[in-house]
């Protein structure tokens, strides 16, 4: 079984990546293959709502000048998908939002392409907005007819500066529990 994780943070190896890595380490210890993709520095265009994906029905977005189609294919090939984001003004990062919007249209246009795959949201927050971000990511999974594993709490870790989430014992334990329940 393979799990692909996307760090939607504008910072590589920051708090969001630390939380995702905690989940992945549990999955790897159970023998699962994992891959972490960092979206930092990528120019990912948002969906232009052209709906061409509904006429081509080829598992691809018509926009070809970024890596979104590569990422959609990685999600197709994996049994599990983790989408992680920091909170920016009470919502997910623009990179992750663009990926979700474009992948979401492709998923729906192609008969629920991710149906029955496991999807988990991971959120890094400083103070507020963690739950709305967590919910928004989970809505993508639900609309895509994916399975969302339970954890001990919401999959949110708190920290301000890089590395601070390691001090959020409850948040880190939640990620470990997510890894245990998400392995299927």
For the regions a protein language model found, what residue spans apply to each?
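Conserved beta-strand segments of alpha/beta enzyme cores
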Residues: 33-35, 60, 147
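Cysteine-centered iron-sulfur cluster-binding motifs in ferredoxin-type domains/subunits
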Residues: 8-17, 44-54, 79
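Helix-loop-strand module that forms the ligand-binding subsite of alpha/beta enzymes
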Residues: 62-153
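N-terminal beta1-alpha1 ligand-phosphate binding loop
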Residues: 2-32
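Glycine-rich phosphate/pyrophosphate-binding loop and the adjoining helix
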Residues: 1, 24, 29-30, 70, ...
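Cysteine-cluster motifs in flexible loop/terminal segments that predominantly coordinate metals
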Residues: 42-75
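A short beta-strand-loop structural module common to alpha/beta enzyme folds
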Residues: 32-42
